[in-house]
Amino acid sequence: MARIEARELDLTEKVVSVNRVAKVVKGGRRFSFAALVVVGDGKGHVGAGLGKASEVPEAIRKGIEDAKKNLIKVPMVGTTIPHEIIGHFGAGKVLLKPAAPGTGVIAGGPVRAVLEAAGIRDILTKSLGSANPNNAVYATIEGLKGLKRAEEVARLRGKTVAELIG
């Protein structure tokens, strides 16, 4: 799969979570920050990244950089997804279900950020397993990676779409 060039897309950034983490050393605690960032163009491209630094703005900048390196293309049918799928990452599981036009994005915080960045307007989701924002975001991305259009599946199986649905 060819890498998606972030420079050619008009990306919007959304900070999903900023976490203060501590390293315990002899003299006490050393604090640093981890920022989870989602980027997307609202037209089917989305990526997520984690940035770590001693200052929040620097962690966010690194997260954006990382997210731009991990862009994926989401196959869409109108304003929703082609079929139901469960994305897994660590202990996080996210169920993604296509929805009728006008339904809107029915999703929790971290999952919603990914779907809105991707440009999906109508979808039903349920976060199963881990409620950790990192796992929820990456499980959503894994689910979106696993989506295939009916035409693509038919081509892979050497059949027509009518035979596949039929």
From Swiss-Prot:
Keyword list (alphabetical) reads: Ribonucleoprotein, Ribosomal protein, RNA-binding, rRNA-binding
Q: Name one GO biological process term.
A: translation
Q: Which Gene3D superfamilies match?
A: 3.30.160.20, 3.30.230.10
Matching entries from InterPro entries are given as: Ribosomal_Su5_D2-typ_SF, Ribosomal_uS5, Ribosomal_uS5_bac-type, Ribosomal_uS5_C, Ribosomal_uS5_N, Ribosomal_uS5_N_CS, Ribsml_uS5_D2-typ_fold_subgr
Specify whether Endoplasmic reticulum is a keyword of the entry.
no
Q: Which Pfam families match?
A: Ribosomal_S5 (PF00333), Ribosomal_S5_C (PF03719)
The GO cellular component terms are: small ribosomal subunit
The chain positions of domain S5 DRBM read 11-74
Q: Which family does it belong to?
A: Belongs to the universal ribosomal protein uS5 family.
Summarizing the function annotation, the protein's role is: With S4 and S12 plays an important role in translational accuracy.
Summarize the subunit comment. Answer: Part of the 30S ribosomal subunit. Contacts proteins S4 and S8.
Q: Domain notes, please?
A: The N-terminal domain interacts with the head of the 30S subunit; the C-terminal domain interacts with the body and contacts protein S4. The interaction surface between S4 and S5 is involved in control of translational fidelity.
Tell me what this protein is called. Small ribosomal subunit protein uS5
Q: Which gene encodes it?
A: rpsE
